[in-house]
């Protein structure tokens, strides 16, 4: 009833337990018609290097100080050292001057003052100090001149005219004083020793000048008026003080 073919299936040729050859895709489809079999082609040659690259990426970097092994960079190695800002940026090419405490000048000035304190020359400051004395003297003379000018300018015009009048009167009073002295000499007749003295020896009411023929023209009452009047005496004393100040 059944026809036995001369060809035996390949699965029967292999002994029991031996792996048989893999069936072809057509056989697998015919044997399992109700199942969907994925017939994607696998590439073992390409999968192998991909797995190797994944293993290389997954393997951690060896740590150690041995030669030839690259060391991992630390985060501290990437930090750049920062410098503290001590001054404001300026356009001066010389840079910032060092900060100095309060009440302290430039180092060169400090050195100059120390040298001056030790007895050395302090620079042009000493010459300036020496030159101040004549200037002060000239200023004092100028002040005195200006003060005298101011006092003369402060005197009003009327007062200046009065001064001139007083000077004229004082000169007249001085002449009057000399006249009074002559009259006094004539009244006493103490200075009538020469021949020309007969003019001064002719006083009224005196008999000593009998040899003199000239009449007595002088009034002896002038002397009495000058001596009796306190005002005239005071004026004469003032005139004497002005004329004979020495």
Curated annotation (Swiss-Prot):
<dbReference type="GO" id="GO:0009950">
    <property type="term" value="P:dorsal/ventral axis specification"/>
</dbReference>
<comment type="similarity">
    <text>Belongs to the MDFI family.</text>
</comment>
<feature type="region of interest" description="Disordered">
    <location>
        <begin position="1"/>
        <end position="76"/>
    </location>
</feature>
<feature type="region of interest" description="Disordered">
    <location>
        <begin position="91"/>
        <end position="151"/>
    </location>
</feature>
<dbReference type="GO" id="GO:0140311">
    <property type="term" value="F:protein sequestering activity"/>
</dbReference>
<dbReference type="GO" id="GO:0046328">
    <property type="term" value="P:regulation of JNK cascade"/>
</dbReference>
<dbReference type="GO" id="GO:0045892">
    <property type="term" value="P:negative regulation of DNA-templated transcription"/>
</dbReference>
<dbReference type="Pfam" id="PF15316">
    <property type="entry name" value="MDFI"/>
</dbReference>
<keyword id="KW-0963">Cytoplasm</keyword>
<keyword id="KW-0221">Differentiation</keyword>
<dbReference type="GO" id="GO:0030111">
    <property type="term" value="P:regulation of Wnt signaling pathway"/>
</dbReference>
<dbReference type="GO" id="GO:0030178">
    <property type="term" value="P:negative regulation of Wnt signaling pathway"/>
</dbReference>
<dbReference type="GO" id="GO:0000122">
    <property type="term" value="P:negative regulation of transcription by RNA polymerase II"/>
</dbReference>
<dbReference type="GO" id="GO:0032507">
    <property type="term" value="P:maintenance of protein location in cell"/>
</dbReference>
<feature type="domain" description="MDFI">
    <location>
        <begin position="99"/>
        <end position="246"/>
    </location>
</feature>
<protein>
    <recommendedName>
        <fullName>MyoD family inhibitor</fullName>
    </recommendedName>
</protein>
<dbReference type="GO" id="GO:0140416">
    <property type="term" value="F:transcription regulator inhibitor activity"/>
</dbReference>
<dbReference type="GO" id="GO:0043392">
    <property type="term" value="P:negative regulation of DNA binding"/>
</dbReference>
<comment type="subunit">
    <text>Interacts (via C-terminus) with AXIN1 and LEF1. Interacts with CCNT2. Interacts (via C-terminus) with Piezo channel composed of PIEZO1 or PIEZO2; the interaction prolongs Piezo channel inactivation.</text>
</comment>
<dbReference type="GO" id="GO:0060707">
    <property type="term" value="P:trophoblast giant cell differentiation"/>
</dbReference>
<dbReference type="InterPro" id="IPR026134">
    <property type="entry name" value="MDFI/MDFIC"/>
</dbReference>
<dbReference type="GO" id="GO:0048704">
    <property type="term" value="P:embryonic skeletal system morphogenesis"/>
</dbReference>
<comment type="function">
    <text>Inhibits the transactivation activity of the Myod family of myogenic factors and represses myogenesis. Acts by associating with Myod family members and retaining them in the cytoplasm by masking their nuclear localization signals. Can also interfere with the DNA-binding activity of Myod family members. Plays an important role in trophoblast and chondrogenic differentiation. Regulates the transcriptional activity of TCF7L1/TCF3 by interacting directly with TCF7L1/TCF3 and preventing it from binding DNA. Binds to the axin complex, resulting in an increase in the level of free beta-catenin.</text>
</comment>
<dbReference type="GO" id="GO:0042802">
    <property type="term" value="F:identical protein binding"/>
</dbReference>
<keyword id="KW-0217">Developmental protein</keyword>
<dbReference type="GO" id="GO:0005737">
    <property type="term" value="C:cytoplasm"/>
</dbReference>
<keyword id="KW-0539">Nucleus</keyword>
<feature type="compositionally biased region" description="Low complexity">
    <location>
        <begin position="14"/>
        <end position="26"/>
    </location>
</feature>
<dbReference type="GO" id="GO:0005634">
    <property type="term" value="C:nucleus"/>
</dbReference>
């Amino acid at each position: 009833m059944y026809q036995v073919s001369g060809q035996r299936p390949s699965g029967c040729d292999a002994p029991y337990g031996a792996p048989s050859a893999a069936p072809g895709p057509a056989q697998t489809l015919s044997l399992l018609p109700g199942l969907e079999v994925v017939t994607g082609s696998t590439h073992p040659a390409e999968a192998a290097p991909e797995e190797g690259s994944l293993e290389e990426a997954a393997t951690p970097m060896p740590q150690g100080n041995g030669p030839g092994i690259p060391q991992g960079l630390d985060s501290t190695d990437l930090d750049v050292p920062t410098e503290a800002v001590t001054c404001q940026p300026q356009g001066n090419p010389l840079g910032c001057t060092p900060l100095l405490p309060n009440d302290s000048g430039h180092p060169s000035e400090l050195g100059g003052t120390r040298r001056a304190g030790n007895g050395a020359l302090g620079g042009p400051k000493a010459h300036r100090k020496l030159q101040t004395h004549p200037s002060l003297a000239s200023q004092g003379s100028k002040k005195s001149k200006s003060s005298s000018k101011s006092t003369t300018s402060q005197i009003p015009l009327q007062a200046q005219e009065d001064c001139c009048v007083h000077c004229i009167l004082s000169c007249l009073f001085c002449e009057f004083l000399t006249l009074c002295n002559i009259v006094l000499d004539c009244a006493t007749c103490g200075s009538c020793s020469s021949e020309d003295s007969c003019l001064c020896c002719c006083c009224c009411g005196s008999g000593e000048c009998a040899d003199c023929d000239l009449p007595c023209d002088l009034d002896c009452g002038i002397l009495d008026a000058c001596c009796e009047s306190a005002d005239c005496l005071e004026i004469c004393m003032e005139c004497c003080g002005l004329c004979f100040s020495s």
